[in-house]
């Protein structure tokens, strides 16, 4: 083997005791070149293997080669690869497994029941537990798909709940587990969708004869912004305060956009001033999209 060849070369060098004589021994150059050539062949084969895995599950491109090798070699023991969650999944701190600990005596694979965000430590229950069966690139793709399905389901519920509650209450509403019903990013998305919908409705009202429609809508936007500002003056935990502050940022942007529409006397939704804005929309098929 190449390891044996290198070991013999090193032992010979030690026995010779002279670096010049050791390096000029007959056949040494050819031997080392052969080892280097075979090593390059192994490296190329390994690269092709890893590229094949990355083609199946593209998020492996965000994992270093050493991490990916460790992940693939321990794929049959999912508990050992959870430490790579942050590298594989965007903004995800860890996955919660059932059972939570590795049992060497059990041949059953665990299931993912929840994922925890690394920002704000938000916890989201999977819409359905994901069994970690098969190869890592296969079951991690299933985890990613279920994460997306989970967030889509949460968004649908959030959008439906929005008009049934006061806005601040909707933003901070908690479930039985004392966790917010919506991930903060989903709340921002749902709010942005209603803002876009309301602006379009305002343009329709103006076209129908309500010349003060945008002025009236600005009053609503400012009122919503003031409600959030007042909420920051109350006792809030860090998580809820962060949710409120991020919503204030978006509401301030919405107010500025409406001010610009008023200042430039925009009367139609087809005007460049409005069409150039990034808009959150919910398509008829339930897909959330960003439109410009």
Name each model-derived stretch.
Residues 1-2, 30, 54:
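Charged/polar interaction segments and conserved charged motifs
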Residues 10, 29-33, 78:
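Extended helix-rich, non-globular scaffold segments
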Residues 14, 18, 39-95:
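Amphipathic alpha-helical packing elements
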Residues 23-27, 53-54, 66-69, 241-243:
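Short interface patches used for recognition in eukaryotic signaling and trafficking proteins
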Residues 25-28, 32-36, 42, 60:
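Subunit-assembly interface segments of extracellular/virion macromolecular structures
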